[in-house]
């Protein structure tokens, strides 16, 4: 079963919603409370329910606000939730198709300083993924505690998938060896867009590139964008990866497993 996730004939971003997801949608949305896990029950308590028209308005408004100010992380988060439902169902389907992905969906791990022992990761051998991630956080002065909570998705299962995507963003940076400057953020957004199909990622990739300085834009077109596209052709889906169980794995072996070639 572990292999099924990697046998998808088309990249996730180009897959259509398959018919079997209709029943999954119904089951996930209408399940009795006693059949939901702790994350799902807690999400339903704080979920903000909106109508289709309100969703349209929020999507348009957050899109405009994100373009005007890319630092409005609340608007970027809102955009992701109001435009990404179909892509999230596809991601959920992909995760359910592999043993590792199913384990994530059952255990619903969270990534923050309360759940991860960063001191332990820092003490690991430097060639491990755990040490690579800890070094990324330190070098870029970032913390896993800054991710926005999900509010506007109807289905709690999709809410977890979106939560997982957000909390894994820095892990993707680390495994790609990409810092957090604007050029690399745009590049990572392209990788995420092509790997997940999330409209928000495409928007960040396309419109983020517009804000690059001339020198950055030349490097982006000459090296970074071609690298992101070429890597994405061979890269395995990242969302089914249980990163927290890979801390001790050699980071180069992990990259080879995922089909990632670093930018030279």
Swiss-Prot record:
Keywords: Lyase, Membrane, Metal-binding, Mitochondrion, Mitochondrion inner membrane, Transit peptide, Ubiquinone biosynthesis, Zinc
Signal peptide: none
Record-listed E.C. numbers: 4.1.1.130
Pfam hit, one: Coq4
Compartment(s): Mitochondrion inner membrane
Membrane topology note: Peripheral membrane protein
Chain segment of the transit peptide: 1-26
Biological function: Lyase that catalyzes the C1-decarboxylation of 4-hydroxy-3-methoxy-5-(all-trans-polyprenyl)benzoic acid into 2-methoxy-6-(all-trans-polyprenyl)phenol during ubiquinone biosynthesis.
SUBUNIT field: Component of a multi-subunit COQ enzyme complex.
Pathway membership: Cofactor biosynthesis; ubiquinone biosynthesis
Cofactor: Zn(2+)
Residues bound to Zn(2+): 169-170, 173, 185
Name of this protein: Ubiquinone biosynthesis protein COQ4 homolog, mitochondrial
Family: Belongs to the COQ4 family.
Primary localization: mitochondrion
Keyword Zinc: yes
Domain of life of the native organism: Eukaryota
An annotated GO cellular component: extrinsic component of mitochondrial inner membrane
Reaction equations catalysed: a 4-hydroxy-3-methoxy-5-(all-trans-polyprenyl)benzoate + H(+) = a 2-methoxy-6-(all-trans-polyprenyl)phenol + CO2
Keyword Lyase in annotation: yes
InterPro entries: Coq4, Coq4_euk
GO terms under biological process: ubiquinone biosynthetic process
């Amino acid at each position: 079963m572990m292999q099924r996730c990697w046998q998808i004939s088309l990249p996730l971003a180009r897959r259509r919603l398959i018919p079997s997801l209709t029943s999954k949608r119904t089951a996930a949305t209408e399940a009795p409370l006693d059949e939901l896990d702790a994350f799902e029950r807690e999400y339903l308590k704080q979920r903000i329910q909106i109508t289709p028209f309100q969703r349209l308005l929020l999507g348009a408004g957050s899109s405009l606000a994100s373009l005007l100010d890319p630092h409005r992380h609340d608007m970027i988060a809102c955009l992701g939730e109001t435009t990404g439902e179909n892509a999230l169902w596809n991601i959920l389907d992909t995760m359910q198709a592999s043993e590792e992905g199913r384990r994530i969906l059952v255990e619903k791990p969270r990534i923050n300083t309360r759940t991860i022992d960063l001191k332990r990761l820092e003490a690991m051998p430097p060639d491990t993924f755990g040490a690579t991630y800890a070094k990324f956080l330190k070098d870029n002065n970032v913390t896993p505690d800054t991710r926005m909570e999900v509010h506007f998705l109807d289905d709690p299962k999709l809410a977890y998938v979106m939560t997982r995507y957000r909390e894994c963003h820095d892990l993707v940076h680390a495994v790609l060896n990409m810092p957090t400057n604007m050029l690399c953020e745009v590049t990572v957004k392209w990788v995420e867009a092509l790997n997940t199909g999330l409209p928000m990622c495409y928007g960040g990739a396309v419109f983020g590139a517009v804000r690059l300085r001339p020198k950055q834009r030349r490097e982006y077109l000459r090296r970074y964008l071609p690298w992101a596209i070429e890597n994405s052709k061979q890269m395995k889906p990242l969302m089914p990866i249980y990163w927290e169980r890979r801390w001790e794995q050699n980071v180069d072996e992990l990259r080879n497993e995922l089909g990632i070639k670093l930018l030279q």
